[in-house]
Amino acid sequence: MSLKAEEITSIIKSKIANFTPQADINETGTVLQVGDGIARIYGLKNAVAGELLEFPNNVKGLALNLETDNIGCVLMGEDSSIQEGDPVKRTGQVINVPVGDALLGRVVDPLGKPLDGKGPIKTNSSRPLEIVAPGVIERQPVKQPLQTGLKAIDSLVPIGKGQRELIIGDRQTGKTAIAIDAILNQKNQPADQRTLCVYVAIGQKQSTVAQVVQTLTEFGAMEYTVIVSASAADPASLLYIAPYAGSSIAEEFMWNKRDVLIIYDDLSKHAQAYRQMSLLLRRPPGREAYPGDVFYLHSRLLERACKLSDKNGGGSITALPIIETQANDMSAYIPTNVISITDGQIYLESGLFHSGMKPAVNVGLSVSRVGGSAQKKIMRSVSGTLRLDMSQYKELEAFSQFGSDLDKESQQQLTRGKRINELFKQDQYTPMPVEEQVLVFFAGTNGFLDNIEVNLVKEYEKQLLTYFKAEKKDLFEELKNAPEMSENLTNKLKEALTAFGEVFKNSHSTAQ
């Protein structure tokens, strides 16, 4: 078959007309130096701060230092496979994390990859790691309570939805235990109104995270919880982005009109990871060798917790950051920074913890700066004088150790203080509904415990709740639904507590 010259010409012309160039244009750079999870890259002149870079073997990096002739980049994976001279590509993207309901009940790393062996996470939604926190107009004041189920906190250091409340104390004083109890207590709410929880483990041992997962699963709390884990074995870069990833996951729920509780456990290790990265990137060190912007590191994170205005859906993020102190020193750099950013702190003391006071909340140094306006009126009516009573009791207790003779009124204060102090004690994983707390504190502050031996207070509390649920159902229900303590309700409670006092006295006199 012979082709004519015109046909050949027309074929060539059509091929030229339909030709589309397939060249893949990539801006690439070269690795100059790599080590300790840091790479220096030559080239990539148009890279922006915070951009995701792609290395060989599917390792990702985050551009942090943009210098005149090179880029300082932290690696999001193992650096042993990267060599000097390797090509590096720009992605033109910032880090995004998968978000949405598909993450509930899952354990993920800060990049959203599953760690629980339950298969891939099926979600099409993602959010950038870092966003600007909502502005003043987009927010509303904190006015709804968030119950933790812990008597010492809900009565004296109340937390509101949208608040940032710091949990601070030495190692092994029960900081994580408070956070886990707060998560467990959200199970008491109806499923459609339940506060969702995000637990961010930063630099924790993997065995500790496994223990948290097991506890939450046992109590049925994993179904409304997401765990973001950057363990002690992970690179500092993953520890650095973990809290921001947790915050992005929480924000998706918040903008969908949900309430979220997020726990950062703990921000001391987060600051240490950032210090490590900054020193390796040759940024100038400041106080305690932390970089100059370590305050901004935490302030931009914690400002993302808020209560949105009704116009924006009214969702909220309540943050409970945890800080570990050394030898009860709250005046160190990171603790003072985070105290000044948050809306109050729950201070746990090792001395109290070892003396058997659990949770070991130091009532004098713990404060909630905005939660008071969110506390339920009925709780405020019984706990209003508690803080003053407890501080007077502590003062008297110290004074009475000198063996001084005390007048009758002071002895009365000591007697009541000892018993109320006993009421603050609570076992782990036993969060208490607010109506039970109100009943117990009402009994304590109105003198119904004054004639009970201190070692029997716990037994009294247990039997009191059982008695009310069985014998005084209607009154207990009325207490549960009452917005505030009316005179009628007060009289009914006093009557019922007097009757129970006789029952308790008789049961113990016969037992003896």
Curated annotation (Swiss-Prot):
EC number: 7.1.2.2
Positions bearing the site annotation: Required for activity: S366
Keywords of this entry: ATP synthesis, ATP-binding, Cell membrane, CF(1), Hydrogen ion transport, Ion transport, Membrane, Nucleotide-binding, Translocase, Transport
Family annotation (PROSITE patterns): ATPASE_ALPHA_BETA
Subunit details: F-type ATPases have 2 components, CF(1) - the catalytic core - and CF(0) - the membrane proton channel. CF(1) has five subunits: alpha(3), beta(3), gamma(1), delta(1), epsilon(1). CF(0) has three main subunits: a(1), b(2) and c(9-12). The alpha and beta chains form an alternating ring which encloses part of the gamma chain. CF(1) is attached to CF(0) by a central stalk formed by the gamma and epsilon chains, while a peripheral stalk is formed by the delta and b chains.
An annotated Gene Ontology molecular function: ADP binding
Keyword 4Fe-4S part of the UniProt annotation: no
GO annotations of cellular component type: plasma membrane; proton-transporting ATP synthase complex
UniProt: ATP binding residues: G169, D170, R171, Q172, T173, G174, K175, T176
Catalytic activity line of the entry: ATP + H2O + 4 H(+)(in) = ADP + phosphate + 5 H(+)(out)
Family in the record: Belongs to the ATPase alpha/beta chains family.
PANTHER family, sorted: ATP SYNTHASE SUBUNIT ALPHA, MITOCHONDRIAL
Membrane topology: Peripheral membrane protein
Subcellular location: Cell membrane
Functional description taken from the UniProt entry: Produces ATP from ADP in the presence of a proton gradient across the membrane. The alpha chain is a regulatory subunit.
Keyword Ligase: no
Protein's recorded name: ATP synthase subunit alpha
Recorded name of the encoding gene: atpA
InterPro entries: ATP_synth_asu-like_sf, ATP_synth_asu_C, ATP_synth_asu_C_sf, ATP_synth_F1_a_nt-bd_dom, ATP_synth_F1_asu, ATPase_a/bsu_AS, ATPase_F1/V1/A1_a/bsu_N, ATPase_F1/V1/A1_a/bsu_N_sf
